[in-house]
């Protein structure tokens, strides 16, 4: 029975995220299933401003920090073998993978 799987990838490292997307696309092409994606989602930006001076006296100067979270979605209509390969996939620690089956 053919199922459809949605793979949602999130990472702060864009190169590792694109590498995992490439591996998933290769798995889909080798097994001959229909693949849709990787679709880039908007980048989430987390901004934090901290004060440079620890004592609180002097001019107010701030350091600004930003973390960007890159996201991708891949839709696969797959059989059991392909889904098992996706579950057994070894991914870097920086990449978070969510797999939704429908």
Curated annotation (Swiss-Prot):
Q: A Gene Ontology MF term for this entry?
A: structural constituent of ribosome
Give the matching InterPro entries.
Ribosomal_uS10, Ribosomal_uS10_dom, Ribosomal_uS10_dom_sf, Ribosomal_uS10_euk/arc
> By its UniProt entry, which Pfam families does this protein fall under?
Ribosomal_S10 (PF00338)
Q: What does the UniProt keyword field contain?
A: Ribonucleoprotein, Ribosomal protein
Q: Which GO terms describe its cellular component?
A: small ribosomal subunit
GO annotation terms (biological process): translation
Query: How is the quaternary structure described?
Result: Part of the 30S ribosomal subunit.
**According to its UniProt record, which protein family does this protein belong to?**
Belongs to the universal ribosomal protein uS10 family.
Function per UniProt: Involved in the binding of tRNA to the ribosomes.
PANTHER family found in the cross-reference section? 30S RIBOSOMAL PROTEIN S10 FAMILY MEMBER
Query: What is this protein identified as?
Result: Small ribosomal subunit protein uS10
Identify the species of origin. Answer: Cenarchaeum symbiosum (strain A)
């Amino acid at each position: 029975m053919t199922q459809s799987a949605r793979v949602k990838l999130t990472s702060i490292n864009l190169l590792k995220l694109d590498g995992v997307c490439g591996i998933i696309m290769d798995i889909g092409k080798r097994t001959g299933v229909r693949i849709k994606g990787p679709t880039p989602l908007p980048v989430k930006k987390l901004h934090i401003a901290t004060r440079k001076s620890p004592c609180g006296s002097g001019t107010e100067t701030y350091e600004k920090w930003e973390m960007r979270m890159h996201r991708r979605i891949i839709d696969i209509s797959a059989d059991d073998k392909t889904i098992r390969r996706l579950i057994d996939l070894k991914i870097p620690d920086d990449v978070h993978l969510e797999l939704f089956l429908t």
